[in-house]
Structures are given as structure tokens and as C-alpha cells.
Amino acid sequence: MADEEIDDVDRAILYALQEDARNMSSGDIAARTDTSDSTVRKRINHLESSEIIKGYSADVDYQQAGYPLRMLLYCTASIPERGDLIPEILDIDGVVSVQELVTGEENLLVTVVGESDSDITPVAQALLDMGLTVADEVLVRSHETTPFGKFDSGNGT
């Protein structure tokens, strides 16, 4: 599904789901978009089958859950291998996300959570054992997200 195929109703659905997918009913979204409940359900199904909506997940406060450390590990992998390494990196205990970067020398950003340094060190070692270079480690104090504003039909776009 190309961007030009996403209309204002799709954008409003995406915005609403980013706000609160767990509690946002198709009826709630229908009221926002001036469409029917069945239209919203069909649109959501289409967005899912087109893999624009890749899934639904909980926004976990790791600190409240007893894992106060969130580290960003900037890594360098060989360009031909970096994409193929992502599933293996995600299998490392403590890794919660991997991003493939396209500019700069560091081309993978690995996010790790843990209770203490002793949880983070084995992750860094596993990355080294895979042949990656860990170029930088950054401790994150807080992490907040917001729905993408261009999906909000009320912002004038």
C-alpha cells in the first residue's frame, strides 16, 4: 500500500490506534472519522494485511517493572550482514529493539534493558561475539512517544 493510497480516514485510524490501541474501539474511531463501525474494521483489516499496521504491543515502563537501566548500544556491522543479523540480535536476552541505521559508521542501534550493569555486559559481549563492534553506549534516563502528527486529521494536514 503506497502512501498515496492512505487517505484521511486511514490516517485518523492510525492516529487513534497510536494514541491507545487497547481501549480505542472501532465505534470510537468511527465517531472521530464520521464513518461506520464496519468501515473502520474493514480499513483496519486492510491496513494490517498491507503490513502498515505490523502489530500491537504494550508500552512498558521498564523502570516501574524493575528494570531501571535502558542502554542504547551503537554498533557497527558489515553492510551486507547488518540486516540479516537483526533477528539473531533480537534473540539476545535483554534486547528489546534493533534499528538499522543508514548514515554514519554505526549502522545498528540496539536497545537493551536490565536491572544492573551485570545484565548489560553479557549483551555487549554477545554482540562482540557476533562480530559487531560496539562503538558507543548511552544510558537513557527517559523515553516518551507520541502518535505521528501527520496522521491527526485535526492538525490541518
Where are these regions (language model features)?
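A compositional/biophysical signature of low hydrophobicity enriched in polar/charged and small residues
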Residues: 1-157
